[in-house]
């Protein structure tokens, strides 16, 4: 228990926040700057934009922002060679024979037929 409290205290005292982002290699990633007067620490091309945003080219990179209050925001970009959603084939939507709607309609027709046949025999 003391070890957990000690580790929690160390984590709070370090005041370092981590941000992870996945992207497609070669595209541009738009991120929000964590603090307006932060210092950029990294070797990737950094393009500041309006509204406290910045753009980076997506490569596997590690960089950080050091804020004036002492908080350090560490970013990790993970570049993928292709997006998993780009080449997925859109399958046609087809109605199966035993879908719930079909079964409900079939049950209602069966019950109606049973009552009409029963009345005809009486």
From Swiss-Prot:
Subunit structure: Interacts with the spike glycoprotein, M protein, E protein and the accessory protein 3.
Motif (Di-lysine motif): 118-122
InterPro entries: ORF7a_SARS-CoV-like (IPR014888), ORF7a_SARS-CoV-like_X4e (IPR044871), ORF7a_sf_CoV (IPR036495)
Name of the featured protein: Protein 7a
Places the protein is found: Virion; Host endoplasmic reticulum membrane; Host endoplasmic reticulum-Golgi intermediate compartment membrane; Host Golgi apparatus membrane
Misc note: Bat coronavirus 279/2005 is highly similar to SARS-CoV (SARS-like).
Membrane topology of the entry: Single-pass membrane protein; Single-pass type I membrane protein
Domain-related comment: The di-lysine motif confers endoplasmic reticulum localization for type I membrane proteins.
């Amino acid at each position: 228990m003391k070890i957990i409290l000690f580790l929690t205290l160390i984590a709070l005292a370090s005041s370092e926040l981590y941000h992870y982002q996945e992207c497609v290699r070669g595209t541009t990633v738009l991120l929000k700057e964590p603090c307006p007067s932060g210092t950029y620490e990294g070797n990737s091309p950094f393009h500041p934009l309006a509204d406290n945003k910045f753009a980076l080219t997506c490569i596997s990179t590690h960089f950080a922002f050091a804020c004036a209050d002492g908080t350090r925001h560490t970013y990790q970009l993970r570049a993928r060679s292709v997006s998993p959603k780009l080449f997925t084939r859109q399958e046609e939507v087809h109605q199966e024979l035993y879908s719930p709607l079909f079964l409900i309609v079939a049950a209602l027709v069966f019950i109606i037929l049973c009552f009409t046949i029963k009345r005809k025999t009486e």
